[in-house]
Amino acid sequence: MAEQSDVIIAGAGPVGMLTALALAQTGAKVTVLEQEPHIINSPRAAVYFPSTLIILEELGILDELNAIGFQNRTFGTHIPEFGYSSVVTTEPIEGIPYDYQLHAGQHDVARVAMEHAQKLGVEVLFNHEVVALDDEPDGVTVTAKTEAGEKTFKAQWLIGADGARSTVRRLAGIAFAGHTWPERFVATNVKFDFLKLGYQQANFVCDPVNMAVIALLDRDGLWRCTYMEDSSLPLETYEERIHQRYEWFMRGSKDYEIVSSSPYMLHQRAGETLHKDHVLLAGDAAHATNPCGGLGLTSGVWTGVVLADVLGAVIRGEEDESILDRFSDERRRVFWEVVSPAATENKRMLQEKDPEQRQKDLAAVRALSDDPDSGAMLMLFAYKVIGDVLRPNSRWKDADPTPNVHLDIAGRQGQIH
């Protein structure tokens, strides 16, 4: 006999677990299936903007994560070709509840969310790999491969939060439209004192060869250094090349310890729909962007919690299922109109090869640095990712505070300009 839930979520990453917690808080019975033996600690996006801190506080886990992670209020942009570095500092803004961004590992966020979700009855099953689904008139049956053989689970709804290579999306026959970039990114976690070299707690390094995103991850001196390399280089030897790249970023210092590393391809893609029959998508399974600027995690989490709100309302009989199509349309709009263009512009600026354009980028960065509102604009842009929360009595109806501040972010196309 298949086990019955209101919702099955595939994927126990931060989006999957935050979505599970949000659904459980609405009273839904939730089962999470994760193919790995435990929550994975891999180098991935680790910055939570003020627009996401709203979610963490509403779900009741922000204080716990603040105690684990690192609160950052500075952002550095470095253009070595011109010997230029700028620092933008975020300051308190009246009407905005947070003046910092939280740096925390995805594994910590997922773990804390899981612990809170389990207290509400969410079942989290590791070593459960989704291998088949059967969408029926009254719900969906999911087959998972386990160490003890295949098991089946039944639910009204299935959410794929299982990453850019989503099995759920593939099994549901949902196309992942867009393109994949020719470059490969390598994300590394490293113990090294970047501050002594003039880096800030979060940094863009703009260079046509040695672009990088460098950020402090915790209070113990662990940093994320993510850089780009040609995808034609052999994947199996990427670790050997890390030291060559570090030579440039660390200016010849050998005083570092590599903790972990992970290569991955970059995408600008979204599901052609995020709702098909009884299957829904969230996180990178719904839409995947290059990581420049941290908007992928931000938008993925917002897609998950908006989905939890509308789906919870459907389960309770407060909303018609048609709201799920509106959810799909709105989250795809936010991705293609806000997230993807901004992340694409960030990536372009970081790796720009044209000398004339690099001069223009330098001027834009200088202007940002000289603008007294620069820190505010940098911080506020990510609120555009919230979009329409679709219900007048949504849990998130008051999440966007930007209409109440004196700065207008409507015309901004990205975080820098």
Regions found by a protein language model. Name each.
Residues E3-S5, A148-W157:
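Core beta-strand elements of the Rossmann-like FAD/NAD(P) dinucleotide-binding domain
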Residues E3-V32:
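N-terminal Rossmann-like FAD-binding beta1-loop-alpha1 element of flavoenzymes
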Residues F126-V140:
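A conserved short coil-to-beta-strand element within the FAD-binding core of flavoproteins
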Residues E115, W157, A161-L266:
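Conserved FAD-binding catalytic core of PHBH/FMO-like flavoproteins
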Residues G11-L21, A113, G160, I258, ...:
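Conserved mid-domain beta->alpha element of the FAD-binding
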Residues V310-H417:
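C-terminal helical "tail/cap" subdomain of flavin- and related membrane-associated enzymes
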Residues R44, Y48-Q118, L216, V339:
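Active-site-adjacent segment of FAD-dependent monooxygenases/related oxidoreductases
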